[in-house]
């Protein structure tokens, strides 16, 4: 990889974090869908609040709570500090940590420390490597896979599907041919479970079944409702080229808000366990998770754990990451108590009701 291309990637990574922290890049025409559902109150919970246990299991590992610090950053100098903060918080709470795209670890050996630092500060929790679908489509060598996994002693490998982001990205790679074939090969050869995630446009039930057929063990739905990476890349495009993107004004707003709401994604993907041969995969709910209440709703819809990137990035930047996570876990404890459930694993769809369902 040439120095110029590597430098472009470094600058892009830096821009992503800066834009997410300082610009309005959320969905403004749709929500994650959690506002459409609420829990049925249990006036007789018959439990003691102090008996509530948030611990659960994920990919066969016990974790302290059903929350993951989701994939966000790495591959540039200042990412080391952010990833250290993420790692320290993950270790403190005993929760999984996803790493940002590790393409830079393959392109530029000088940027490896920004990824490797997470295992130094999170030695005992599940940590997940991450690479993009375009890189998978081109075929990852055994050496590439070894670098990704060994650098952080990864417990799983995330493959992120980001077609909309690549479409808007000034230097984006929009060749998504052969992703599924190469994903199947990856699942058959990699020594750790493979997780497939979107980055904010969601994964439908139909798409989920295709990647499960390929051998994927976990689906992170990453639905619409949180960060719109189309907006992030649109800002970069305008800054670089000093003009609007190549789409018509009539279509642009819809494309910037393109995606399936997170709650719908969870419900669709979860239903596959009832209607297909795939019964043992796990679901991560991300995309617009803003509280422990959203996590609770995700679990009741069928997710195993919830995850957040954007909200926790802001918290880490403001040095209040552990405080934010603790608040979210308190939210979750409150929901468990008020539904009469003593653990996250016991939340079910029957605890939910559509807000606008007719009374009679």
From Swiss-Prot:
Family statement drawn from the similarity comment of this UniProt entry: Belongs to the IPP isomerase type 2 family.
Organism classification: Bacteria, Pseudomonadati, Chlorobiota, Chlorobiia, Chlorobiales
Keywords noted in UniProt: Cytoplasm, Flavoprotein, FMN, Isomerase, Isoprene biosynthesis, Magnesium, Metal-binding, NADP
One cellular-component annotation, GO: cytoplasm
Cofactor: FMN; NADPH; Mg(2+)
The protein's name in its UniProt record: Isopentenyl-diphosphate delta-isomerase
Subcellular location: Cytoplasm
Subcellular location, principal: cytoplasm
Catalysed conversion reaction: isopentenyl diphosphate = dimethylallyl diphosphate
SUPFAM superfamilies per UniProt: FMN-linked oxidoreductases (SSF51395)
Enzyme class of the recorded protein, top EC level: isomerase
The keyword Cytoplasm is assigned to this record: yes
Annotated binding of Mg(2+), by residue: 166
Highest taxon in the source lineage: Bacteria
Entries under InterPro entries matching the protein: Aldolase_TIM (IPR013785), FMN-dep_DH (IPR000262), IPdP_isomerase (IPR011179)
Quaternary structure note: Homooctamer. Dimer of tetramers.
Annotated EC: 5.3.3.2
GO molecular function: FMN binding; isopentenyl-diphosphate delta-isomerase activity; magnesium ion binding; NADPH binding; oxidoreductase activity
């Amino acid at each position: 990889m040439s120095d110029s291309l590597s430098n472009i990637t470094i600058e892009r990574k830096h821009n992503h974090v800066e834009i997410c922290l300082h610009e309005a890049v959320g969905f403004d025409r749709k929500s994650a869908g959690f506002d459409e559902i609420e829990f049925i109150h249990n006036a007789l919970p018959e439990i003691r609040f102090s008996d509530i246990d948030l611990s659960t299991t994920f990919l066969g590992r016990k974790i302290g709570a059903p929350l993951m610090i989701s994939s966000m950053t790495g591959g540039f100098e200042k990412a080391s500090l952010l990833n250290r903060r993420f790692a320290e918080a993950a270790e403190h709470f005993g929760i999984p940590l996803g790493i940002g795209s590790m393409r830079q670890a393959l392109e530029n050996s000088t940027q490896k420390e920004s990824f490797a630092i997470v295992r130094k500060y999170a030695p005992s929790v599940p940590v997940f490597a991450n690479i993009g679908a375009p890189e998978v489509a081109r075929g990852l060598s055994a050496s590439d896979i070894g670098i990704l996994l060994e650098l952080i002693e990864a417990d799983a490998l995330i493959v992120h599907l980001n077609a909309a982001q690549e479409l808007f990205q000034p230097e984006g790679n929009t060749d998504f041919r052969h992703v599924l074939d190469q994903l199947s090969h990856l699942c058959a050869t990699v020594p750790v479970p493979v997780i497939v995630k979107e980055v904010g446009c969601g994964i439908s039930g139909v798409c989920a079944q295709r990647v499960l057929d390929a051998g994927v063990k976990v689906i992170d739905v990453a639905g619409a409702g949180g960060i719109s990476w189309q907006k992030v890349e649109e800002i970069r495009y305008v800054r670089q080229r000093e003009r609007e993107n190549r789409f018509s004004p009539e279509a642009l707003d819809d494309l910037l808000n393109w995606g399936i709401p997170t709650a719908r994604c969870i419900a669709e993907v979860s239903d596959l366990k009832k209607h297909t041969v795939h019964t043992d995969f796990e679901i991560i709910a991300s995309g617009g998770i803003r509280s422990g209440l959203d996590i609770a709703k995700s679990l009741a819809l069928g997710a195993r754990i919830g995850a957040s990137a954007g909200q926790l990035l802001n918290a880490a930047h403001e040095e209040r990451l552990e405080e934010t996570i603790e608040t979210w876990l308190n939210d979750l404890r409150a929901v468990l108590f008020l539904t009469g459930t003593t653990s996250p694993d016991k939340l079910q769809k029957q605890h939910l009701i559509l807000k606008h369902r007719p009374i009679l």
